[in-house]
């Protein structure tokens, strides 16, 4: 939980060795990168809004990670965190994002017309398609560190911006605190709303403070374009629909997102972005595009194939269970999405999903007929 600066000064009465966390049983990127030397060097630093090294790492100290799943183990409290604590963040970013170096530049491409295909994924296998990203509003602390006033200001700005959208994007904001339990649960079950903050990662990082104050969901009239306000990021923008038309989902995503960005810019509140990290977000795993383009796809045979994991890796895709992170697949339906966020563009990342899923559906159809797919195994992308 973020503390005031005085608390950090109080800690300096103890030697770095006495304050250094025990990370001996940890499996996360932070624990791998945080040496005693780095801890010594950074522990008395703080960002202009008062975020400290211990605030950055607390979630990773409290959640050692999973023997098979490498979590990130740290968060940013504001835009400056990535600069002030770069000695810790840089190796974590390099490790998490396939060797992305401190000197590398990210690229952005939100021109949906650059996507090839994507309108012909077989709906008998691809049940739904979704693209999401996060955005942070410049000048405000991020959710692990923002005050109640800041969070409410972000909500007010966001609602004003979103309510000015027209046409296919015309919609309405639903604050969490005025929803009944049933309404909330229904939206969660329909995959429209974020879960209640029970995740230890959310809790330990301070993101769940004052819940549900100033949190909510905005969506257009036909629920195909949604914005979450003040969950893990200031904004999470989501375009989704049933079936396999990823081309249309991505078009709506790009157009809606750029409209929102334009409105915020005009109001004097651009999104946090720089040419090294792309869009700046709370979790280092989302830096770059912040984009996750995913489909729910039925792969009853391919998922039992001994090379399933290898095929995903070669296609630069990752799988989750049907309900998202840390859940099991129900009825052989997997949530398959791009593994990369940083160093490649939005179009490139969605292209990998479209091409990879198309290939996997073709493999699935061959396996149904009892045919071999050995000649279809892709090379590493």
Curated annotation (Swiss-Prot):
Cell location: Cytoplasm
Residues bearing the modification Phosphothreonine: 166, 180, 313, 322
Binding site residues for ATP: 128-132, 191, 236, 292, 320-325, 335
Any single biological process term in GO: phosphocreatine biosynthetic process
Role, per record: Reversibly catalyzes the transfer of phosphate between ATP and various phosphogens (e.g. creatine phosphate). Creatine kinase isoenzymes play a central role in energy transduction in tissues with large, fluctuating energy demands, such as skeletal muscle, heart, brain and spermatozoa.
Family: Belongs to the ATP:guanido phosphotransferase family.
Protein name, entry field: Creatine kinase M-type
């Amino acid at each position: 939980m973020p503390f005031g600066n005085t608390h950090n000064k109080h800690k300096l009465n103890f030697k770095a060795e006495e304050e250094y966390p025990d990370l001996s049983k940890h499996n996360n990127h932070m624990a791998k990168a945080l040496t005693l030397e780095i801890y010594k060097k950074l522990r008395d630093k703080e960002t202009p809004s008062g975020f400290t090294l211990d605030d950055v790492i607390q979630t990773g100290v409290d959640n050692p990670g999973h023997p098979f799943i490498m979590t990130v183990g740290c968060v940013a409290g504001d835009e400056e965190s990535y600069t002030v604590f770069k000695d810790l963040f840089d190796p974590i970013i390099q490790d998490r994002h396939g060797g992305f170096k401190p000197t590398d530049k990210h690229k952005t491409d939100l021109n949906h017309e650059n996507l090839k295909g994507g309108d012909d994924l077989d709906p008998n296998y691809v049940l739904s398609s979704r693209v999401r990203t996060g955005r942070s509003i410049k000048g405000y602390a991020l959710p692990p560190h923002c005050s109640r006033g800041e969070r409410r200001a972000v909500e007010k700005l966001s609602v004003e911006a979103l309510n000015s959208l027209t046409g296919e994007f015309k919609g309405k904001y639903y604050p969490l605190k005025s929803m009944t339990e049933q309404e909330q649960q229904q939206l969660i079950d329909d995959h429209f709303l974020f879960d209640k903050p029970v995740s230890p990662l959310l809790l330990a990082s301070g993101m769940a403070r004052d819940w549900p104050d100033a949190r909510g969901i905005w969506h257009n009239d036909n629920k195909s374009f949604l914005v979450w306000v003040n969950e893990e990021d200031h904004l999470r923008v989501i375009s989704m629909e049933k079936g396999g038309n990823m081309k249309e989902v991505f078009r709506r995503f790009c157009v809606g997102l750029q409209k929102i960005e334009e409105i915020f810019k005009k109001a004097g509140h651009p999104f946090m972005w720089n040419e090294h990290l792309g869009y700046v977000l709370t979790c280092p795993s989302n830096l770059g595009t912040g984009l996750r383009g995913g489909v729910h796809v039925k792969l009853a045979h391919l998922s039992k194939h001994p090379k399933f994991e290898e095929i995903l890796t070669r296609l630069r895709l990752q799988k989750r269970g049907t309900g998202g992170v840390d859940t099991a697949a129900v009825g052989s339906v997997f949530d398959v999405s791009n593994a990369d966020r940083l160093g490649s563009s939005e179009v490139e990342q969605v292209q990998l999903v479209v091409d990879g899923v198309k290939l996997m559906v073709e493999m699935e159809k061959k396996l149904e007929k009892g045919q071999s797919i050995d000649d279809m195994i892709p090379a590493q992308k």
